[in-house]
C-alpha cells in the first residue's frame, strides 16, 4: 500500500501545487500559516515538516525560524522532494532546510530532536496513523507542539454534499485535463477512511501526547490537529 501511495505522489509532483489550490479553493496558504503559528515555532528552533510534498510548509517554517534555525522536510516521494529542492534554490536568501527522503513510519532522527513540527495533507495518506504519530512523538522534544492539517468529511450533510460535488465535478475533471485523473480519484475514498477529529485526538493521546485538540476549519471540510508532547 505504501508503494502504491508513493507512486501516486511521484506521478502528481509536476501539478501538485496547482491541484492543492483547486482542492482548497486557494485557501491552503492561509491555513498553513495558521498551523505554523499553532506550533509555537520561533527563531532559532529546529523544526520538522512531515509529508512535506513540494516544500510549501517547510519553506514557511524556514522563514519563521530564520537563519539561526533549521528545518527538516521529509517525504517518501523523490519527485516531490526534487520539486521542493528546486523551489528552495530559487529563494533568496537560501532557506536552511534539509530535504530527507524517508517514510514517516520510520523517521531517521534521534529522540527528542525537534522544537516543533507540521504535517500538511499527509496524515490521511499514511498507512498506519498511530505508528506515524508515535514516531512524531518520539522525535519531538518534551513540551514541543505539532500541527497536523488535512482535509476531512464535514458532519453537516449540506457541506458534505457540496464537498463531494466539488471533488466529482471540479477537481477530478481538472485533474483529468492534467493527465492525473486516476491519481486524484483516490481523494474521496481516502476521506471516507480518515478518522474524524475526535478519533484523531484519541489516537494522539493513546500514543503518548499530553494534550490533543482538533479544530474544524472551512465548515468541517478541513481540520487541524494540535498536539503537545
Curated annotation (Swiss-Prot):
One of its GO terms (biological process) is phylloquinone biosynthetic process. Its EC number is 2.1.1.329. It comes from the Bacteria. Coiled coil: none annotated. It catalyses: demethylphylloquinol + S-adenosyl-L-methionine = phylloquinol + S-adenosyl-L-homocysteine + H(+). The keyword S-adenosyl-L-methionine applies. The keyword S-adenosyl-L-methionine applies. Keywords: Methyltransferase, S-adenosyl-L-methionine, Transferase. Pathway: Cofactor biosynthesis; phylloquinone biosynthesis. Pfam families: Ubie_methyltran. It is an enzyme of class 2 (transferase). One of its GO terms (molecular function) is 2-phytyl-1,4-naphthoquinone methyltransferase activity. Belongs to the class I-like SAM-binding methyltransferase superfamily. MenG/UbiE family. Methyltransferase required for the conversion of 2-phytyl-1,4-beta-naphthoquinol to phylloquinol. PANTHER family: 2-METHOXY-6-POLYPRENYL-1,4-BENZOQUINOL METHYLASE, MITOCHONDRIAL, METHYLTRANSFERASE. This is 2-phytyl-1,4-naphtoquinone methyltransferase. The gene is menG.
Amino acid at each position: 500500500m505504501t508503494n502504491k501511495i508513493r507512486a501516486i505522489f511521484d506521478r502528481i509532483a509536476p501539478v501538485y501545487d496547482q491541484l492543492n489550490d483547486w482542492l482548497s479553493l486557494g485557501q491552503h496558504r492561509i491555513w498553513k500559516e495558521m498551523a505554523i503559528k499553532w506550533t509555537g515555532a520561533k527563531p532559532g528552533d529546529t523544526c520538522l515538516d512531515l509529508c512535506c510534498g513540494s516544500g510549501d510548509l517547510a519553506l514557511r517554517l524556514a522563514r519563521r525560524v530564520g537563519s539561526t534555525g533549521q528545518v527538516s522536510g521529509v517525504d517518501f516521494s523523490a519527485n516531490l522532494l526534487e520539486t521542493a529542492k528546486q523551489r528552495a534554490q530559487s529563494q533568496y536568501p537560501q532557506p536552511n532546510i534539509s530535504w530527507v527522503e524517508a517514510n514517516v513510519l520510520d523517521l531517521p532522527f534521534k529522540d527528542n530532536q525537534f522544537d516543533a513540527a507540521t504535517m500538511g495533507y499527509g496524515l490521511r495518506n499514511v498507512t498506519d496513523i498511530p505508528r506515524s504519530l508515535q514516531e512524531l512523538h518520539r522525535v519531538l522534544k518534551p513540551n514541543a507542539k505539532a500541527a497536523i492539517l488535512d482535509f476531512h468529511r464535514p458532519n453537516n450533510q449540506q457541506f458534505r454534499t457540496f464537498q463531494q460535488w466539488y471533488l466529482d465535478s471540479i477537481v477530478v475533471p481538472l485533474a483529468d485535463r492534467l493527465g492525473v485523473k486516476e491519481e486524484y480519484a483516490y481523494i474521496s475514498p481516502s476521506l471516507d477512511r480518515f478518522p474524524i477529529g475526535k478519533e484523531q485526538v484519541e489516537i494522539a493521546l493513546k500514543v503518548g501526547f499530553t494534550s490533543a485538540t482538533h479544530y474544524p476549519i472551512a465548515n468541517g471540510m478541513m481540520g487541524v490537529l494540535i498536539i503537545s508532547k
